[in-house]
Amino acid sequence: MKRLHKRFLLATFCALFTATLQAADVTITVNGRVVAKPCTIQTKEANVNLGDLYTRNLQQPGSASGWHNITLSLTDCPVETSAVTAIVTGSTDNTGYYKNEGTAENIQIELRDDQDAALKNGDSKTVIVDEITRNAQFPLKARAITVNGNASQGTIEALINVIYTWQ
């Protein structure tokens, strides 16, 4: 009888453990990206001095200053990098141009590329990396413009950010 009792206890004990040793599904998620090594950014800051502009020249809608050239340069692009994209961002006003944060009123900032395409907030431009020099350049130009006319005296200040991505 003792033997039967021991077997019964052993069977019950095993049954209890088997219930707790059930398998569970496990999911392992692995993430990552393979990206091209970045180029060296040579033009870390570009300052454009528009000089003194005269209100008498900025009274008519669409009046603007002369263009001022800007070149954003990248060097030492690795062989795996074939193109670079620049995305421009900045504060805009209700005209869609970059907002003048200075004290002059009715003045906006216009940015264009070397093909005369407008580069407004969120726009991008892609250039091919030179296969021999491994460099990339973004020739741009900026000017002050008065969309509605009647520009007032004051300062002109705008900040346009550039974010690069590599392909």
From Swiss-Prot:
Gene3D superfamilies: Fimbrial-type adhesion domain
Signal peptide interval: 1-23
GO BP term, example: cell adhesion involved in single-species biofilm formation
Methyltransferase keyword on record: no
Keyword Signal assigned: yes
GO cellular component terms attached to this protein's record: pilus
Alphabetized InterPro entries for the sequence: Adhesion_dom_fimbrial, Adhesion_dom_fimbrial_sf, Adhesion_dom_sf, Bact_Fimbrial_Adh_Pro
Cystine crosslinks: 39-77
Record key words, sorted: Disulfide bond, Fimbrium, Signal
Family designation: Belongs to the fimbrial protein family.
Compartments where located: Fimbrium
Primary location class: other
The name this protein goes by in its record: Uncharacterized fimbrial-like protein YdeR
